[in-house]
């Protein structure tokens, strides 16, 4: 077992019974100091031999050239974070958010004692350009889930796929964002629902709070005006008006728009997961059949989903082509023999 040592305490911090014992030892000459060493507590905790170094020590992310430039105060915030060399066109950080005095002022409030470690500083500097770049002008919600943000920041190969050895893990980014929520610069969606089908929780999203925008140095008055204008033009408000929840002259609040947006994202995630689970279940059933039987079963399935007018004019050759294409999408190799 490993031993855990606790710093010494002054005798005045001890309970009354122990204070009497300390003075008795001091008068008897058995104690020569007023600092009392507490009993050593034994624990089973051990420092492992594994490396705690993150996979991606120096993540970076800049807005690609093919992206449309951000407008208004969002563009101003991004330009304060990132600068572009006019000669070479290379982008680099103009402002390191990890060194902002706000993190020093609110350190105790967030439950920290010390400054950020270098690897966390670099991750925090890389996260903020992504948050600003994908933030909605109306709700200030980042349009990516935490797992999608981790994938976006992670280094990629020439084909655009994440390199597993250098990826930014979801757990690492999730801990960082949760700490930013404690600092008050980010907000996070409420506790997500549990999806029994996939045994996973629905995605979580974050948004930038007014404290976060103030750190970025934007004009809060202009930001609020642009936010209200975008909310009045938003699809969420038009949908509520069509449903009769809002009148034409009523405005939607930021909280209501954000809650409605998150509900839509949750429903989209559920639909996608249900469709994916149904496709996988169908693929597992078709794997047991011969190739010609797979095509026949898939053809019947496609025919049932077709509109009546389209199904009437669909030829057997066209239906077979659709079935083969659907089978390839289900990752079924028709050339392989069926399992026995």
From Swiss-Prot:
Residues 38-58 are annotated as: Disordered. Keywords: DNA replication, Plasmid. Signal peptide: none annotated. GO terms for biological process: DNA replication; plasmid maintenance. InterPro entries: Plasmid_replication_init_RepA. It holds the Pfam family IncFII_repA. NCBIfam families: RepA_IncFII_LM. This is Replication initiation protein. The gene is repA1.
């Amino acid at each position: 077992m490993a031993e855990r040592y606790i710093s010494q305490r002054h005798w005045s911090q001890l309970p009354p019974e122990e204070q009497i014992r300390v003075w008795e030892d001091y008068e008897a000459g058995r104690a020569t100091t007023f600092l009392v060493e507490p009993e050593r507590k034994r624990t089973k905790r051990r420092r492992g031999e594994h490396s705690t170094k993150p996979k991606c020590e120096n993540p970076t992310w800049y807005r690609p050239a093919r992206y449309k430039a951000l407008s208004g105060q969002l563009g101003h915030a991004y330009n304060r974070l990132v600068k572009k060399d006019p000669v070479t066109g290379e982008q680099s950080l103009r402002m390191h958010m990890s060194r902002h005095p706000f993190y020093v002022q609110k350190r105790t409030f967030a439950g920290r004692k010390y400054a950020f470690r270098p690897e966390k500083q670099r991750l925090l500097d890389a996260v903020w350009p992504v948050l600003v770049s994908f933030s909605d002008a109306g709700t200030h919600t980042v349009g990516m889930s935490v797992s999608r943000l981790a994938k976006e920041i992670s280094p990629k190969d020439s084909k655009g796929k994440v390199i597993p050895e250098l990826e930014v893990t979801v757990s690492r980014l999730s801990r960082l964002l949760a700490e930013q929520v404690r600092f008050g610069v980010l907000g996070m969606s409420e506790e997500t629902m549990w999806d029994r089908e996939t045994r996973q929780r629905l995605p979580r999203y974050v948004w930038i709070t007014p404290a976060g925008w103030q750190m970025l140095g934007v004009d809060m008055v202009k930001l609020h005006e642009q936010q209200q204008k975008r909310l009045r033009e938003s699809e969420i408000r038009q949908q509520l008006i069509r449903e009769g929840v809002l009148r034409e002259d009523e405005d939607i609040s930021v909280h209501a728009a954000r809650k409605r947006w998150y509900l839509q994202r949750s429903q989209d995630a559920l639909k996608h997961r249900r469709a994916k689970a149904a496709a996988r279940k169908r693929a597992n059933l078709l794997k047991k059949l011969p190739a010609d039987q797979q095509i026949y079963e898939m053809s019947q399935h496609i025919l049932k989903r077709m509109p009546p007018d389209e199904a009437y004019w669909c030829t057997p050759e066209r239906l077979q082509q659709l079935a083969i294409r659907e089978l390839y999408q289900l990752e079924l190799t028709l050339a392989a023999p069926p399992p026995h």
